[in-house]
């Protein structure tokens, strides 16, 4: 299992220092979607354009971003 890091980025930032082990990039995407959905549900003011979860791999390389927004479906911007 590889460790991925899920940072809060945008108007308010927070760096994930512990990370989370995932079996694959696909699983990391699902975990990032879960985090984004949870933040939007618990803290609706954070669900704004420009706020997202930035996912980094074990080497600190950004691999994709998941927007934090309210509503069905999620989009994803591939970085690497």
Task: Explain the meaning of each model-derived region.
Residues 44-45, 50-80:
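C-terminal structural segments of small proteins and small subunits
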Residues 1-16:
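Short aromatic-glycine-(Arg/Gly/Cys) micro-motifs in beta-strand/loop hairpins
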Residues 14-25:
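A short, exposed loop/beta-hairpin motif centered on an aromatic-Gly-Thr core
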């Amino acid at each position: 299992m590889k460790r991925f890091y899920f940072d809060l980025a945008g108007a308010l930032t927070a760096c994930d220092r512990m990370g989370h082990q995932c079996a694959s990039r696909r699983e990391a995407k699902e975990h990032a979607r879960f985090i984004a959905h949870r933040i939007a549900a618990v803290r609706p003011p954070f669900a704004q354009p420009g706020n997202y979860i930035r996912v980094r791999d074990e080497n600190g390389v950004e691999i994709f971003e998941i927007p934090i927004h309210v509503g069905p479906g999620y989009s994803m911007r591939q970085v690497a």
